């Protein structure tokens, strides 16, 4: 039987998203939200490497001691790109799955991709991972924190997609040669279906492949 899995994300909203997803698969999660909202999370991501490592390591150690956790599911793109989870995994002995693991496998399959992320920290981490895996890949990206804030407020997906002009953004990416649009923020599957109905650009969501890597 799988031991409880550390579920870490930037805010309570996206942390609960993956808690619910794992529960549907019969996996117990240990709730570990880093920040109370997206603005605080962005501030955390631009803090020093030492500060970020200390916070995450402490949460890992606490979950290990209380629940015997051996794995962590990091459900936040920008957090994954701004924290050295490989080093923390080595220090704590926790096996870590992040969206970046999926991107490493994804990159060689494409020549041109578009990425939408929560902020520039997230976009930079995704870009670095994709290009290390496929240096010939052409990338275009956008950081759209206002969309994350709208999701946190509970705005309806169809209204959100329209108000933030996401179909126009997707169509611009397509016109520039993008083969697919990568959802580079774990909040964004919230509007995936609504946007899919408004664009012909294929939309990539790393969540399902992350579950496979976790062994679910």
Predicted regions and their residues:
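Non-catalytic structural scaffold of enzyme domains
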Residues: 1-216
